[in-house]
Amino acid sequence: MIALGSDHAGFSLKEEIKKHLDETGVEYVDVGCYSPERFDYAISDQKACDKVVSGECTAAILCCGTGVGISMAANKVKGIRACCCSDYFSAKYTRLHNDANALCMGERVIGAGLAIELVDVFLNTEFEGGRHQNRVDQIMAIEKGEKLY
């Protein structure tokens, strides 16, 4: 199950992603927003990320105008490793090497076609582990307030 969230500026992109997920049989829960009326991304962001952290969902897909604000908010939720992506390579390698569990995109930055490609590669790429696991462990240690130096 995937958690989807957006603000008003990412609403239309989220709706296009929902259509694609429906067509491909990927289950999701939409935590809002539910219209193009003004809505602050931190609310839907936190709802979606909480579902990932609790284990109810395996990943979050989050949309706002640029993807930046919603990714900043997502990374404040303990246990979330969010990445703002606008290209295929980053969307793939954020999963492959960084074990990201939230993909953030900007409706004002990329079109629906590219966004769907990024969603597909993000959801279908497994974490490689190995030498990258230590780096993910370091990220999580920083989140806990540990010093790496």
PLM features per residue range, with description:
Residues C33-Y34, T66, E107-V109:
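Short, ordered loop/turn segments at secondary-structure junctions
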Residues K47-C84:
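Helix-adjacent hinge/juxtasegments
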Residues E37-Q46:
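Structural motif
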Residues E27-R38:
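A short beta-strand-loop structural module common to alpha/beta enzyme folds
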Residues A3-G5, A9-G10, Y88-Y149:
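C-terminal binding/interaction regions
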Residues A3-E23:
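Glycine-rich phosphate/diphosphate-binding loop of Rossmann-like nucleotide-binding domains
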